[in-house]
């Protein structure tokens, strides 16, 4: 077994290097997904019916269709629809961000609705602008309440990003597939990739628990 690991050590390093690509997609998607999610959530709790309908329609589209189809449309159809040919990385980052935004919006909406409405009414009575009420009072409490759900979204993004390998991106999954074809050994490369995903998820979960404890104390 030890000799086997030494023999395949260059291949193992080749697979592990894909972790950076996987992490890059996930971080970009969770950042932009959070921004999109906040904007959509604000639309969903807005009194303007048109904004609510738009946000609900957006969410239904991205929650109601597979991520693979969304990625395929953005990558293959964008030259015909908008005249722009996205790279695999750009298409992946855009599709993951848009998809994540739909799910995050529902999480944030629930967090906003969970905040005591009396706080909003009290702030309004003090003539505080609605924008500041939402930014300084409601959203900070909502984010604190939904932080575990946001962590789960990041973990899901890390695992779901594996579909980008189908478009030729050299992420963890693609590198494991390449090594499998080169060595005629499918099991070992996939175990290495699985270990990398597992370590990433456990590391993020550990960091998230530390942050969550600090949020609870604050």
Curated annotation (Swiss-Prot):
Name of the protein in its database record: Putative glutamine transport system permease protein GlnP
GO molecular-function term, one example from the UniProt record: transmembrane transporter activity
Pfam families from the UniProt entry: BPD_transp_1
Membrane topology listed for this record: Multi-pass membrane protein
Entry-linked InterPro entries: AA_ABC_transptr_permease_3TM, ArtM/GltK/GlnP/TcyL/YhdX-like, MetI-like, MetI-like_sf
ABC transmembrane type-1 domain sequence ranges: 19-208
The organism of origin for this protein: Rickettsia bellii (strain RML369-C)
Annotated function: Part of the binding-protein-dependent transport system for glutamine; probably responsible for the translocation of the substrate across the membrane.
Major location (coarse): membrane
TM region positions: 25-45, 57-79, 86-108, 187-207
